[in-house]
A protein has these predicted regions:
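Substrate-binding groove of N-acetylhexosamine-processing glycoside hydrolases
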Residues: 1-260
Length: 260
């Protein structure tokens, strides 16, 4: 921030920040005091995750939009990344996308139920599955298990962090087997709520993506349980089947490039 005054007067800085407590207020005040046009860039909280970090994204979006207005920013730039492989289900983007539009348009906060209704209506053109609510509920997994890792979900970290000893030490310091089991049960309830509901084509594709994200998260939490129990070789899931499901979900929306 102290270097903001060194920027050319034609520069238009973008203040990036993705956590619920990112200091947009302080940073915006510094940049605005230099007389520069600027924007704030919150995030969807979806990357490096299988279910998103919806509560963090919600708070991050609210802070960005409110501080953009407070400090006279040109607006907000919603960011969604594919860091480390784009493993997130596409549908986890929708709540953040619609909520950022709501906040930028009139600045009014929304509770989750009307936002879920908006996702159902505007994205899926149907409320049969109430998929908007299920997406946001799955996005609470990290809060459910008491994890507050910055810029990633614990479930994603359990599957993709190669430093196993570091992961185990993190679990032993910050997690318990009970929390891991609670997280697995939490995800199972979402699956049960979705099962048997009628759906249209858009809902069906998004539901498949979400269920795959939930399955990957469950696999990860089971891996966490194994690490906590001292049995890291335990691997009960069917890896080839999961890879086939992931390939199918990927190719339903994207080109093959990046899949391998």
């Amino acid at each position: 921030p102290e270097n903001a005054s060194l920027l050319a007067p034609t520069a238009e800085p973008i203040i990036w920040g993705y956590e619920a407590d990112h200091p947009f207020d302080v940073q915006s005040e510094v940049v605005a005091s230099c007389g520069l046009s600027f924007r704030l860039a919150p995030g969807t909280g979806t990357w490096r995750s299988f279910t998103s970090r919806w509560p963090d994204a919600r708070a991050n979006l609210e802070s960005a939009s409110e501080n953009a207005l407070k400090h006279g920013a040109e607006g907000i730039l919603l960011t969604t990344w594919g860091d480390c492989g784009n493993h997130q289900p596409w549908c986890t983007l929708y709540p953040s996308l619609l909520y950022s539009a709501q906040l930028a348009w009139n600045g009014t906060r929304l509770d989750d139920p009307p936002l879920a209704d908006a996702v159902n209506c505007m994205v899926f053109r149907s409320s049969h599955m109430n998929l908007g609510a299920a997406i946001m509920e799955a996005g609470r997994l990290d809060r459910q298990i008491g994890s507050r890792l910055p810029n990633r979900s614990l479930a994603w970290n359990l599957l993709f962090e190669e430093r196993r000893d570091e992961v185990r030490r993190h679990l032993e310091k910050n997690q318990t087997a009970r929390r891991m089991r609670d997280g697995i049960d939490f995800l199972s309830r979402i699956v049960e709520e979705l099962s048997g509901r009628n759906s249209n084509r858009k809902e069906s594709l998004a539901a498949e993506e979400l269920l795959l994200g939930i399955e990957l998260s469950s696999i990860a939490l089971n891996k966490g349980l194994a690490l906590l129990s001292g049995n890291p070789q335990q691997d009960p899931h069917d890896t080839p089947q999961i890879l086939r499901k992931y390939e199918k979900a990927w190719l339903a929306r994207a080109r093959p490039g990046g899949l391998e």
